[in-house]
């Protein structure tokens, strides 16, 4: 029983196992239960706001390789610049940030924050140094613009290009889109050496070491979601490059060369924690019906470099509960004692009550392991018709941070853990609060059957089906009204002492069985019975006299 995480939801916590190369909360103990990773699940759920999806499919953000560059002190006299560069999986722009001028120059959706530097960030000679600092680029990148919505990102998108300032039209970058080293971002596996050569100066566009922070701006405007990049970057190892830019003369012209060599690859892993999970498979989003389907998908809590981008990733979370109309084969009782007394009275006094439909509130709480989620998901996909069916923390950080930075990082991780725990406890408390407010049938434990009568005219099955799918449109108001009615019915039952009705029935039944009551009844009717007997005897005597008289008259007439 899951619901998709949408672009209107607050960012969720995504934990990585390496605090040196990827910013954000870290946890190298995930997954909590490796044996349950990859459990099969079939889903068919609805949505109201666009869901968050990653992969090569309509409605999902596409993956791509992105580069981050820092400049380090030059040691060679022939080198103009010396670089360290990191390449990793990121989010693919729909159009280049320099190609869409309407979005580029629009400041309507520009976030508040530090502007990205105009110069390439400086670093140390250590190749394992990459200091992340969030900043806002001068132009925006469009990640998606279709019927599923418009999603943008204001993070810098670094790339090498030719500086054609003062050059002729023969410069390769005289067009709107500068010449980008496409081979550099083609693969993270095949190429370990890159050489860029040109008679024109190589420069780095969109400076800054900042992570993508996509957000939706149409049809609604939602918060930024920086956690998506931490999922994407862990789907493949990151590659570390080191190199320099040299200047020489060819044909009496300056000739620029950039040599980059890969010296290190770093595997990563990113994880989410309950109640959030990752559905991986052939996910299909249907905007016309606002539904998401996926057959033979798998449930994960972690993504690593073995991920296959032929699949898609859908972020989901466990649902706290739902309302389902069901039929019961016996009357609703609040406790087993009432049930026993009712059965006794039914046998002794031949009294019965009839309940046709009730509403069942499935209080599932938070799904703590993926196994529970898989079973609940399959159950939701199959049928919902009856009561029986429903039934190392800072690894290698000293090489990058000083002692104070390390302490800050540990505190930040603990705060993120605390925040995630508080969110989990808050959802759990809300579930328990709702459960305590309900008056439930005694014969169920994992869910609650309320005494509210199901009104098919107010909540027809199509509304129930959309509620089960998780579509939060106008049905939300109807469900809220239904909850109020159920809580009112529960309060009405709580105003009575438990078992009062049954005990009153027992008292009435025992009163009817009291012999004294029977004697009083006989005394009160004895006189009437005697009078009736006398009347009957008188009538009988009269009939007899009449019969005898008739016989005498007949004998006289027939005499001699």
Swiss-Prot record:
Residues 355-375 are annotated as: Fusion peptide. GO terms for cellular component: plasma membrane. Expressed at higher level in the thymus. Expressed at lower level in peripheral blood lymphocytes. Keywords: Cell membrane, Cleavage on pair of basic residues, Disulfide bond, ERV, Membrane, Transmembrane, Transmembrane helix, Transposable element, Viral envelope protein, Virion. Induction: Induced by type I interferons and by Epstein-Barr virus (EBV). Changing residue 534 to I: In allele HERV-K18.3. The record marks 354-355 as: Cleavage. InterPro entries: GP41-like, HERV-K_env, Retroviral_env_glycoprotein. GO terms for molecular function: structural molecule activity. Specific enzymatic cleavages in vivo yield the mature SU and TM proteins. The chain crosses the membrane at residues 522-542. The surface (SU) and transmembrane (TM) proteins form a heterodimer. SU and TM are attached by noncovalent interactions or by a labile interchain disulfide bond. Belongs to the beta type-B retroviral envelope protein family. HERV class-II K(HML-2) env subfamily. Retroviral envelope proteins mediate receptor recognition and membrane fusion during early infection. Endogenous envelope proteins may have kept, lost or modified their original function during evolution. This envelope protein has superantigenic properties. Orthologs in P.troglodytes and G.gorilla. Has a type 1 genome. The HERV-K(HML-2) family contains type 1 and type 2 genomes depending on the absence or presence of 292 nucleotides at the 5'-end of the env gene resulting in Env proteins of distinct sizes. Despite their overall retroviral envelope structure HERV-K(HML-2) type 1 envelope proteins lack a predictable signal sequence. Subgenomic RNA transcripts coding for full-length envelope proteins have been detected for both type of genomes. This is Endogenous retrovirus group K member 18 Env polyprotein. It comes from Homo sapiens.
